[in-house]
UniProtKB/Swiss-Prot annotation:
One of its GO terms (molecular function) is RNA polymerase II cis-regulatory region sequence-specific DNA binding. CDD domains: T-box_VegT-like. Transcription factor required for both mesoderm and endoderm formation in the embryo; signaling determinants and concentration levels may determine which germ layer is formed. Acts together with beta-catenin to activate genes that are responsible for mesoderm induction including wnt-8, eomes t/bra, siamois, mix1 and sox17. Directly binds to promoter DNA. Patterns the mesoderm along the dorsoventral and posterior axis. Activates siamois gene transcription when alone or in combination with beta-catenin, but inhibits siamois transcription in combination with pou5f1.1/oct-25. The gene is vegt. Vegetally localized in oocytes and expressed in the presumptive endoderm and mesoderm at early gastrula stage. Expression is down-regulated in the endoderm by the end of gastrulation but maintained in the lateral and ventral mesoderm of the blastopore lip. This is T-box protein VegT. Residues 308-326 have a biased composition (Polar residues). Residues 229-276, 295-360 are annotated as: Disordered. It comes from Xenopus tropicalis. Gene3D superfamilies: Transcription factor, T-box.
Amino acid sequence: MRNCCQEHRLSAGHLEPEISSSCASDVKSSPDMDSVSSQDSLYLPNSVGASLEDQDLWAQFHQEGTEMIITKSGRRMFPQCKIRLFGLHPYAKYMLLVDFVPLDNFRYKWNKNQWEAAGKAEPHPPCRTYVHPDSPAPGAHWMKDAICFQKLKLTNNTLDQQGHIILHSMHRYKPRFHVVQSDDMYNSPWGLVQVFSFPETEFTAVTAYQNEKITKLKINHNPFAKGFREQERSHKRDDVLKTLQQSPSKRQKRKKWEDSPEAEISDFPKATRVKEESIMDPAGVYQNWVSDHEANQGLTPHSPESDGANQEQQVPSSSSNFYNRNPYRRSSQHLSSPYDLGEPSSRRLTPDVATVPDSDPDSLAVLHVIPTQNSTQDRTCGVNFSMEAQMKQPLRGAMYSPYGAEQWMVPAQGQYRPMGYTAYPTDLSTQGAVAHPHSGMSDWSQYSLFPYSCW
């Protein structure tokens, strides 16, 4: 009897199959068990039982030869392993584990709609045991509801590091359910072990379904099967075909709309539909762009050079004022082509200075130039302004002179040493070359760079 109990403890540590009947009888007749109360005798190891859930579904698969898909990343089982336990002590803690053992030592193949042996089985990989995530838990927790191993996955990757069950393809296996009494998975010793297995759960591991009947059963009972997704795609294709059947009438309506005048108007470019706005001279609005001499010549609000519409508005800036005061730079520019005049302003990138449009020589012959009096340079304005609100304002002269005389005042004599040259004249137009008494570079070092304090 002692030898049997020692073998029983060894089997509990290594998760061996069921306890033998002789050992179980010895446990019942032991003197230690006689002192156990009648209430505790209800929770003896031999009183623990288990039943398979979804047994009818498992029976349908077992009749055709159950197949389970295994992949490199791991695949869940269907039908799922689901059992129900009873006879456990409600306050004692138990652990629930599952492992898979081969049914025989053969490798199988699918031939002529049946499985047949095809040789010796491959060496079994290291046995792995899947521990239920709720372990350890009191017996009342395990007996409360059916226990499902939903997250259990099967793989054929021998180097798997995710804890999946490693199996060989074309081999037959069966799952075993172990009930272990233990308060802790690692520290406390394991108690008595009860092992359960069900013949309906036997299956053949495959990488692809071999039996078409098994495939149909999977599609009909597994809501996550691939066949359901293919069926949804077929429904979508049917919807597309229905829309294609209605498309001729829609195309006919589209054709009628294209023949209507509204479609012709919508096909015109945006530049041709832009409302032409009246043009006015910049002298009436931006007086700082035109000198006093030109403002007094009585320029008309409508520029004769611009017959087309132009949506571009020129905003005065510091650089634009300098540009209009420099006749040499302005004379080097050209007029823009007439196609640029009708282009929307949102698509044109205007520079900081006031630009003068360019044009080809043929278009220059059409434009008329207003000659200015007492001036040898052509200062015609090639920019059109579209601001109707400012047309009624009278033409005015410049609001300020370019420079004041105070900026060119000669510094006090006490600040710098006496020099042999005169200060700059107030009239900027009469400035000329100034003769300096110093001819060498070394003589310039005793004076400041600028003889005037303008900033």
